[in-house]
């Protein structure tokens, strides 16, 4: 729903003479138009499908992600701030081995400065990876499974794809299934981020994911 925004003019103190009031009014009108235009881009998605709700450390969110990835038939799209979980990394490798197209977007700074990332190992196995460099923090934690299918899934929440998110942190995770309009919106946003990200050049790795 688009809500009209009325420009609010500043309060002028008694005895103060405003310079160029026409220009100031124009600025506020332009600002109001920009707000309305931005709201016009918002799109409500009808509720449908099912929702699996998990809270760590009590629920097995990591296991739920691994099981969902195991059911992927043709595509998995990942947006990761952190991806250090070996079970999740192995599930992505297994998916690729059975012919599923797996593609990953990752935060550049965390990959550069962090430890135990699964990204080098995944890239070395042939999974395409792009690094997000445009933003201060690429903080999305999203997985899209068979996003163009009627029974596809969106995985999202505060949950990073890490051991700590499962065992030490208080996190939430949603697995939303069977909402094609929502899946398409997430996939469109994923592709928008990929278009401005930088391809990751895979480096040789040891079996444990470290550099030789």
Task: For each feature predicted by the language model, list its residue ranges.
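Bacterial N-terminal signal peptides
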Residues: 26-35
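N-terminal targeting signals for Sec/Tat export/insertion, comprising classic cleavable signal peptides
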Residues: 48-77, 81, 188
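Structural recognition of the beta-strand scaffold that forms the well-ordered cores
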Residues: 77-80, 103-107, 130-131, 144, ...
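Signature of lipid phosphatidyltransferase scaffolds
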Residues: 146, 150-212
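Solvent-exposed loop/turn segments at secondary-structure junctions
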Residues: 82-86, 108-112, 135-137, 149, ...
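Short, low-complexity, charge-dense intrinsically disordered segments
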Residues: 1-11, 21
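Primarily the HKD phosphodiesterase
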Residues: 67, 71-128
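Boundary at the C-terminal end of the N-terminal hydrophobic targeting segment
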Residues: 39-44
């Amino acid at each position: 729903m688009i809500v009209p925004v009325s420009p609010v003019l500043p309060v002028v103190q008694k005895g103060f003479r405003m310079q160029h009031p026409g220009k100031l009014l124009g600025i506020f009108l332009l600002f109001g138009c920009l707000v309305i235009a931005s709201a016009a881009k918002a799109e409500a998605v009808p509720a449908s499908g099912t929702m699996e709700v998990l809270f760590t450390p009590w629920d097995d969110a990591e296991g739920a992600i691994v099981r969902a990835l195991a059911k992927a038939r043709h595509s998995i799209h990942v947006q990761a701030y952190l991806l250090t979980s070996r079970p999740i990394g192995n599930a992505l490798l297994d998916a690729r081995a059975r012919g599923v197209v797996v593609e990953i977007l990752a935060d550049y700074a965390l990959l550069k400065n962090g430890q135990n990332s699964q990204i080098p190992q995944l890239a070395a196995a042939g999974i395409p990876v792009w690094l997000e460099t445009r933003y201060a923090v690429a903080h999305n934690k999203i997985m899209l499974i068979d996003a163009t299918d009627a029974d596809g899934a969106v995985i999202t929440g505060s949950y990073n794809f890490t051991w700590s998110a499962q065992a030490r942190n208080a996190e939430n995770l949603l697995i939303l299934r069977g909402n094609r309009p929502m899946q398409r919106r997430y996939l469109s946003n994923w592709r928008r981020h990929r278009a401005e990200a930088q391809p990751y050049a895979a480096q040789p790795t040891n079996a444990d994911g470290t550099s030789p």
